[in-house]
Amino acid sequence: MPNDDAYSKPSAPSEAPHAPGPPPQGKAGGFSKALLGTSGGGGSGGSSGGGSGASGMSAASNKKSPRLPKCARCRNHGYASPLKGHKRFCMWRDCQCKKCNLIAERQRVMAAQVALRRQQAQEEELGISHPIPLPSAAELLVKRENHGSNPCLMTESSSSSQPPPPPPAASTPTTAAPEGRMVIQDIPAVTSRGHVENAPDLVSDSTYYSSFYQPSLFPYYNNLYNYPQYSMALAADSSSGDVGNALGGSPVKNSLRGLPAPYVPGQTGNQWQMKNSETRHAVSSQYRMHSYYPPPSYLGQSVSQIFTFEDGPSYSEAKASVLSPPSSQDSGLVSLSSSSPISNESTKGVLECESASEPSSFPVTPVIEERTK
């Protein structure tokens, strides 16, 4: 029978079927294919069912609350306690075992890194430091060969306003030439903040740090912000001189009226100079202001450059020579009354009375003689 023949060869669907029995062969082939399909479908269904079960478990875990952090010190000692509100009450808070020491060291390193990132961000905003790409080894070798003839890169003999570029990042500090001193000394190789193995993106400018420790090229402006070292009396002179110019008086007359009590000049100009030298900083003669320095922008135009502390005449001597004869003893009174902090009109009245007091002694005698006659 063709059906028996078909059942006897269920696993030969590739062979040429017999002529009389193509439909039964097709049935058998279809049955075997159906069996294979059911078995394959079962396998695929099992795998898909397993996958759907796994996905269902992951979805259920996602629906749960997020994992709470556990205390690392308690975990080192075999306990699992949530970290929230547990820091003060941890039993192993002061533990000095090997694992807990490792945790403390890691915390210190992370805190230092956070502080370093914050400081670098602040310096980048202020423009103090800027990113510098680190050169390769071949470029460093070429730079060292080029700079071999000139060992002193930045000396005090250079008078340009813009400083020369800093030395390469990995080069050692060079030796100074005999005619000038080095401005950059003992600057770290890559950066001033460590992390040699992982070089940071921001490398601080070497001239920024050298300006703190080394003297500048111009000795008069020897501090960081280039403020000239004026004494208090000259600052008071400049402010009162501006007021005097607004009122219409000369700067020399009005500058002495607004001075506070410690700076009122005495009988001679020597005391004025002594008080000036006491109040200003201990600056040697090379820091003295000369006439070729430009006046600072925040001072008024009434401050003359000709009058220096040591060279020029004092203001009290100039006023005494103008307002009274040099032989009279009223020069101290005139200078003191002119420097008193009162209004312009009353000062002028006092000066007129004092200047007129001396010649008024001459015309008194004829009046008395006429009355006696």
Swiss-Prot record:
Residue positions, PTM Phosphoserine = 338
- The residue ranges marked as DNA-binding region are 67-113
Q: Where is this region: Disordered?
A: 1-72, 148-179, 316-373
Entry GO MF terms: cis-regulatory region sequence-specific DNA binding; DNA-binding transcription factor activity, RNA polymerase II-specific; metal ion binding; RNA polymerase II cis-regulatory region sequence-specific DNA binding
Main localization, broad class: nucleus
Give the keywords, sorted: Activator, Developmental protein, Differentiation, DNA-binding, Metal-binding, Nucleus, Phosphoprotein, Repressor, Sexual differentiation, Transcription, Transcription regulation, Tumor suppressor, Zinc
Comp. bias (Low complexity): 8-18, 327-346
Ranges of compositional bias, category Gly residues: 38-54
A single GO CC term for this protein reads: nucleus
Localization, per the record, is: Nucleus
Judging by the UniProt lineage, the source's domain of life is Eukaryota
Check the record and name the PROSITE patterns matching this protein: DM_1, DM_2
GO terms in the biological process aspect are:
male germ cell proliferation; male sex determination; male sex differentiation; negative regulation of meiotic nuclear division; negative regulation of transcription by RNA polymerase II; positive regulation of mitotic nuclear division; positive regulation of transcription by RNA polymerase II; regulation of transcription by RNA polymerase II
Xref: PANTHER family: DOUBLESEX AND MAB-3 RELATED TRANSCRIPTION FACTOR DMRT, DOUBLESEX- AND MAB-3-RELATED TRANSCRIPTION FACTOR 1
**Described purpose of this protein according to its UniProt entry:** Transcription factor that plays a key role in male sex determination and differentiation by controlling testis development and male germ cell proliferation. Plays a central role in spermatogonia by inhibiting meiosis in undifferentiated spermatogonia and promoting mitosis, leading to spermatogonial development and allowing abundant and continuous production of sperm.
Q: Which family does it belong to?
A: Belongs to the DMRT family.
**What is the official name of this protein in its record?**
Doublesex- and mab-3-related transcription factor 1
What is the gene called? DMRT1
